[in-house]
Amino acid sequence: MRKIAIYGKGGIGKSTTTQNTVAGLAEMGKRVMVVGCDPKADSTRLLLGGLSQRTVLDTLREEGEDVDLDDIVSPGFANTLCTESGGPEPGVGCAGRGIITSINLLEQLGAFKEEKKLDYTFYDVLGDVVCGGFAMPIREGKAQEIYIVVSGEMMAMYAANNICKGIVKYADAGGVRLGGLICNSRKVDNEDKLILALAERLGTQMIHFVPRDNQVQRAELMRKTVIEFSPEHPQADEYRALANKIDQNQMFVVPKPLSIEELEKLLVDHGIMN
């Protein structure tokens, strides 16, 4: 089983990209589990047809320790398995700690056992590596591969660079590696060249450039992935291509993060200044 974590700046489109990619893998016949590591609990909504799923932490609060796997894992599109860690009540506790609790419980209940015949587990992780809890999939070897969703905007690239620093920090202990950058286009000038240059400087690859298309929003309004909502649409093929590239990927590296000055120079050389 391949264990993958998707990181990136908040609002970059991680959950949408993850769910559409997972739909592409599931369509290929892969058995995939998605673990939402975000207090918003929106990492599996499109795979579940918009059904709001009771989170692991909510279930623990309501049921106590007497929890079955079926209480927290739901079947989604094309035999995917979906679970959401959730978070603490607003203003109380630590959401990162909730991720640790949730993943540990899933392991105790046998969610990742061999008899489940999983090909992939995807961890969709909130925002930047803001604290130890959110870094947990990297830190404790829960994820082997990291893909960073990025765009040509400065803050998205800054977050990607920070995440690379987290990967470097835990590469020896957890054995985690960077699989590549996924450019989720914001239609910034020279965006593809900019992210290709960033990937090269980090020592990785831009594994796929996902063009911006309103079909993604249309599908989301219908609470579906593009692959389920409009399987013949060119945007569905973009996510299939990304899924296939991840499936075939052999390039796993310890990245080489840039200084803030190097990052700004990259933007000047390749970005909107030209």
Curated annotation (Swiss-Prot):
It comes from the Bacteria. [4Fe-4S] cluster binds at residues 94, 131. One of its GO terms (molecular function) is 4 iron, 4 sulfur cluster binding. Keywords: 4Fe-4S, ADP-ribosylation, ATP-binding, Iron, Iron-sulfur, Metal-binding, Nitrogen fixation, Nucleotide-binding, Oxidoreductase. It is an enzyme of class 1 (oxidoreductase). Coiled coil: none annotated. The modification ADP-ribosylarginine is found at residue 97. One of its GO terms (biological process) is nitrogen fixation. SUPFAM superfamilies: P-loop containing nucleoside triphosphate hydrolases (SSF52540). Its EC number is 1.18.6.1. It catalyses: N2 + 8 reduced [2Fe-2S]-[ferredoxin] + 16 ATP + 16 H2O = H2 + 8 oxidized [2Fe-2S]-[ferredoxin] + 2 NH4(+) + 16 ADP + 16 phosphate + 6 H(+). ATP binds at residues 8-15. Binds 1 [4Fe-4S] cluster per dimer. The reversible ADP-ribosylation of Arg-97 inactivates the nitrogenase reductase and regulates nitrogenase activity. Its cofactor is [4Fe-4S] cluster. The key enzymatic reactions in nitrogen fixation are catalyzed by the nitrogenase complex, which has 2 components: the iron protein and the molybdenum-iron protein. Belongs to the NifH/BchL/ChlL family. Homodimer. This is Nitrogenase iron protein. The gene is nifH.
